[in-house]
Amino acid sequence: MAQEPIAVDETLIESVVRTFYGRVRKDHLLGPIFEEHIRDWEPHLQNMFAFWSSVMLHTNRYNGRPMPKHVVLPIDSAHFDQWLDIFKKTVEELCVKEDAELFMKKATQIAHSLELGLAFNNKVLLQPGERYIRNKDHTL
């Protein structure tokens, strides 16, 4: 049976998203990338509220396609690791332990999927357990 959130609601999701992206914008690795690609932050945040509402509460509020937005970014495994680190600190600070773990389980799955999608889009063949590193010669 799938684990269900204990204390996650729309208010908590908004708090997680706003806190997380506030930290991302200040991050030395991620901040410049986000600032270059997002001009108006509020629509992006609203989209992320809908995304995480769909992920955590099964609301079906999000109907976007995240892969096309990410394949154009100059990111690789180091960026996903940093993203996950900031996300983990955020949910551990704002959520009860079980919900933080569930958020992280979902976030890790999403990051892994996006990383594999980036590799595939860039014609990179990863071996089992290998991570995507931009400009490393694994082309198909």
Locations of regions flagged by a protein language model:
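Core of compact, soluble alpha-helical bundle domains
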Residues: 1-140
